[in-house]
């Protein structure tokens, strides 16, 4: 199995690659972790990971700047239904639009917009930086065996914007930051996490292993 982690100039690429290699090794999964900016290699991969940090519009421009990459993603994920994981802004790009400073079109895979977080508790700072628990709304194989909820493991977040999904069924998990904030989305063969699995220690490694085992 070959897992393509897309290098388009954004994301914690080294830590993501190392986390996927470690999760595969510790789970006894035979996987080649391929950090690549080659659209053809993405198109032929068995699983695809889209990381991302920074501004939505910048990440979209970076993705568009890689020849054939958006086309390869749409063909491989939508038409060929290969398993896909978006991380942080990589998850946000699954949306229809980003509303950060300007309106930017996303990939349009998950109905909804990415908008600024406005916590009900004014003492909570933006961005949210640090550890928070997740609450699973819809069971999904990527959360198999992962303790969640008030007594669950913590995930690591760094973000000022959140995906406001139109369909509640697409929201797999939330976190509480002055109100519910989308922590994970998914439908069909695609999932995305607002938190960083590669920085989320046991929760993150378990989620990555589940993604590698997942057969949508």
Swiss-Prot record:
Coiled coil: none annotated. One of its GO terms (cellular component) is cytoplasm. Pathway: Amino-acid biosynthesis; L-histidine biosynthesis; L-histidine from 5-phospho-alpha-D-ribose 1-diphosphate: step 5/9. The keyword Lyase applies. It comes from the Bacteria. Its EC number is 4.3.2.10, 3.5.1.2. The active site is at 88 (nucleophile), 196, 198. The keyword Cytoplasm applies. One of its GO terms (biological process) is L-histidine biosynthetic process. It is found in: Cytoplasm. One of its GO terms (molecular function) is glutaminase activity. SUPFAM superfamilies: Class I glutamine amidotransferase-like. It catalyses: 5-[(5-phospho-1-deoxy-D-ribulos-1-ylimino)methylamino]-1-(5-phospho-beta-D-ribosyl)imidazole-4-carboxamide + L-glutamine = D-erythro-1-(imidazol-4-yl)glycerol 3-phosphate + 5-amino-1-(5-phospho-beta-D-ribosyl)imidazole-4-carboxamide + L-glutamate + H(+); L-glutamine + H2O = L-glutamate + NH4(+). Residues 2-216 form the Glutamine amidotransferase type-1 domain. PROSITE patterns: GATASE_TYPE_1. Keywords: Amino-acid biosynthesis, Cytoplasm, Glutamine amidotransferase, Histidine biosynthesis, Hydrolase, Lyase. Heterodimer of HisH and HisF. IGPS catalyzes the conversion of PRFAR and glutamine to IGP, AICAR and glutamate. The HisH subunit catalyzes the hydrolysis of glutamine to glutamate and ammonia as part of the synthesis of IGP and AICAR. The resulting ammonia molecule is channeled to the active site of HisF. This is Imidazole glycerol phosphate synthase subunit HisH. The lineage of its organism: Bacteria, Pseudomonadati, Pseudomonadota, Alphaproteobacteria, Hyphomicrobiales.
